């Protein structure tokens, strides 16, 4: 009997980040719940959904790691995406009805690069009706499935890199490095319209989230093979420390007294601290205890602190 079908599981406090390689055909929440059961975790969350058809990097936060998930939600991300040309669909992927079919013009690398150039930098996107954004409390995709369409506000996103990887008479493959909130399905749909033939996503893989990359990913099938009901803590070796989630912030070492007051919720002065932004907090033993923020008066206020076990 595996952790995924065991009727009653002992749940424990376990902290860390798992860089899951989400398989295709599974929702992000389904993947999350399976990982949560495998680790017997009391608390778990992910840091930004992937579409069911998508594969790749889905950071799973266990225990105290959930306190820092916002920093990965707000991080840049990278993808490889393959699109079919000549066919536009309602959702921008292969899992919804076809809207239009048009002939594909003769494409050259020069013409493709010229089209892609317009989508680099800061661009406006109108989210698809088949997205998790909410309208009056209802996810847009649920409204779309009822045949209801509502007006969506455009949003600005940044495409840091948009590289043509491959193309042929029917498809195009791109590498995308983008800011938070970028809809890859919408991006490919817009590129297809700019080419005059339409396009939709047939394969999508997330390669990076912040500084985490695909070489660090663990497959769900591997975890399930490694799972041992009698020694489930054996999977803990795949968890990364909490501090890796915020390693891009400068670190501040605290004295025992300043660490004490911060942990009581009080803002403190720390010599030679940065003048603005978030900082990693380390106690007198050089142990990570959480994240603080520099206030306008130069004091450091606690923002996310780890609960000591």
From Swiss-Prot:
Official protein name in the record: tRNA pseudouridine synthase B
Entry keyword Oxidoreductase: no
NCBIfam families: TruB
Family affiliation: Belongs to the pseudouridine synthase TruB family. Type 1 subfamily.
TM ranges: none
GO molecular function: pseudouridine synthase activity; RNA binding; tRNA pseudouridine(55) synthase activity
SUPFAM superfamilies: Pseudouridine synthase, PUA domain-like
Upper classification of the organism: Bacteria, Pseudomonadati, Pseudomonadota, Gammaproteobacteria, Legionellales
Database matches in InterPro entries: PsdUridine_synth_cat_dom_sf (IPR020103), PsdUridine_synth_N (IPR002501), PUA-like_sf (IPR015947), PUA_sf (IPR036974), tRNA_psdUridine_synth_TruB (IPR014780), tRNA_sdUridine_synth_fam1_C (IPR015240), TruB_C (IPR032819)
Gene behind this protein: truB
Family annotation (Pfam families): TruB-C_2 (PF09157), TruB_C_2 (PF16198), TruB_N (PF01509)
Gene Ontology process terms (BP): mRNA pseudouridine synthesis; tRNA modification; tRNA pseudouridine synthesis
Source organism per UniProt: Coxiella burnetii (strain RSA 493 / Nine Mile phase I)
Active site: 51
Task of the protein: Responsible for synthesis of pseudouridine from uracil-55 in the psi GC loop of transfer RNAs.
HAMAP family: TruB_bact
E.C. designation(s): 5.4.99.25
Taxonomic superkingdom: Bacteria
Reactions catalysed, as given in the entry: uridine(55) in tRNA = pseudouridine(55) in tRNA
Enzyme class: isomerase
Keywords from the named record: Isomerase, tRNA processing
